[in-house]
C-alpha cells in the first residue's frame, strides 16, 4: 500500500515528545483503541531494538497479530518502526514518526504508515477498506497522544512484558 501520513500538533517541546515516543511501552497508551493485548518483546522498552507484539482489532481481520521494532532512532527528529502483520506475518509494516518544531514550544508530529502486502488477497483486503480504517485509527491515536502529553488525559495502560 502506498504510504499515508497523518499529523497533529502537540503543545510540548520536541525533545519531550520524542522521549515519550522512544519508549515503545508508551505506544499502548495512545493506540489501545485499535491495538489490543500490547506486549513488549524485551525488557528494555526504550530506543533502537525495542519492540512489541499486539492484536490489530480491525473488522473482518482473521489474522490479527502483528509486531513492530524500533529500527531507526534519531533524537529528537525521527523514529522508525518496522514489523510484520497478517497470516504467517507475511505483510511488512513500516511506521515513521517525524517531529518538526512548531511555533512557540509546539511540535508537529507526522506519522507515516506503509504496508507491503505479500499476496493478491492481502492487497484486496487493503483496497476493501483496511487502508482507510488504519488512517482513521492513526489520526485518532495522534489526537490521543496530544491529549496525553498536553493534558494528561485519555491515558491508557502502558505495555508490559509478554509472559
Predicted features and spans:
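Beta-strand/loop substructures that line and gate deep hydrophobic ligand-binding cavities in soluble
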Residues: 84-139, 156-158
Amino acid at each position: 500500500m502506498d504510504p499515508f501520513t497523518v499529523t497533529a500538533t502537540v503543545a510540548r517541546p520536541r525533545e519531550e515528545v520524542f522521549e515519550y515516543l522512544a519508549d515503545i511501552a508508551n505506544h499502548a497508551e495512545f493506540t489501545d483503541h485499535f491495538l489490543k493485548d500490547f506486549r513488549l518483546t524485551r525488557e528494555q522498552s526504550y530506543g533502537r531494538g525495542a519492540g512489541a507484539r499486539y492484536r490489530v482489532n480491525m473488522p473482518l481481520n482473521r489474522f490479527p497479530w502483528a509486531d513492530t521494532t524500533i529500527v531507526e532512532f534519531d533524537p529528537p527528529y525521527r523514529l522508525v518502526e518496522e514489523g510484520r502483520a497478517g497470516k504467517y506475518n507475511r505483510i511488512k509494516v513500516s511506521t515513521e514518526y517525524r517531529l518538526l518544531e512548531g511555533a512557540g514550544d509546539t511540535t508537529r508530529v507526522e506519522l507515516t504508515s506503509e504496508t507491503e502486502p505479500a499476496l493478491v488477497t492481502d492487497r484486496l483486503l487493503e483496497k476493501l477498506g483496511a487502508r482507510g480504517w488504519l488512517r482513521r485509527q492513526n489520526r485518532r491515536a495522534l489526537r490521543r497522544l496530544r491529549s496525553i502529553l498536553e493534558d494528561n488525559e485519555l491515558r491508557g495502560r502502558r505495555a508490559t512484558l509478554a509472559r
